[in-house]
Amino acid sequence: MADSEADKPLRKISAAFKKLAIIVNSPNPEVPVTQFSHACSLVSPLFGCLGIAFKFAEMDYVAKVDDLVRASSSISTLVVMMDKDIEADCVRKAGSHTRNLLRVKRGLDMVKVLFEQIIASEGDNSLKDPATKSYAQVFAPHHGWAIRKAVSLGMYALPTRAHLLNMLKEDEAAAKIHMQSYVNSSAPLITYLDNLFLSKQLGIDW
C-alpha cells in the first residue's frame, strides 16, 4: 500500500528518535548501537531527496551509518564502542567507529537544523534558505573549499518544498508535526553525543 505508515519516511524517523530520546533522558542512559544505527539509517533517504547539493553528505553519512550497523553485531552500546576505540588508540583514525559516530552525529544535527528552518519558513516553496543555513551551520566548518563550492552550486538544483513533501509522501500539516517531533527528539540525543565525546576528552571539532 503506497499510503501505509511504513511507506512514510518521516513517520518512521519520528517514532525511532522518540525512543532514543526516552533512553538519553533516562537517569543512566545506555544507547544500544543496534537501535541507534537503525534510527540513523532511516534518515539516509532524506539526503537523497535533497539532490546534488547534498550528494557528498549523503554518501559520507550512509557509509558511516553502515559501519555502525556492522559494529552493532558485536558491540552493545555507544559507550562501549568508544571505550574500545580509546583502548585501541584509534579514535581519530579514518574508519574508526568513534570517528564515524561523530560524522553521523553531524548528519543528524544538519537534518535537525534543516527541519527547524523548513518549519520556520512556512509558506515559502523554496528550500534554498533552509538548506543553505543548515549546511553553513553544521557541515561547512568541516568541509574544504572544493566541497563547499560544489554544495553552493548544487543549492540551485534543490527540490521545491512541495516536491520534497511529495517524495516524503506527506502533506504540509503532517510533515510539520513529524519534523517537529524529530527536532524535539534529536536535540537531547545530539547533546548526549556531544557530552559523551567531551566527557572522554575527545572533543567534537575534528
Swiss-Prot record:
Resulting phenotype, residue 47 to Q: Decreased activity
Keyword set includes Metal-binding: no
What name goes with this protein?
A: Accelerated cell death 11
Instruction: Give me the Gene Ontology terms describing cellular component.
Output: cytoplasm
- Sequence similarity: Belongs to the GLTP family.
For this entry, list what GO says about its biological process: cell death; defense response to bacterium; response to salicylic acid
- Pfam families in UniProt: GLTP
Protein task: Exhibits selective intermembrane transfer of ceramide-1-phosphate (C1P) and phytoceramide-1-phosphate. Does not transport ceramide (Cer) or GalCer, suggesting a requirement for phosphate in the headgroup for functionality. Transports in vitro sphingosine, but not glycosphingolipids. Also has some in vitro activity with sphingomyelin, a lipid not detected in plant tissues. The transport function may be not directly involved in regulating cell death.
Tell me which species this is from: Arabidopsis thaliana (Mouse-ear cress)
Consequence of substituting residue 60 to V: Loss of lipid transfer, but no effect on PCD suppression
Per UniProt, subcellular location reads as: Cytoplasm
Gene3D superfamilies annotated for this entry? Answer: Glycolipid transfer protein
UniProt keyword annotations, A-Z: Cytoplasm, Lipid transport, Lipid-binding, Transport
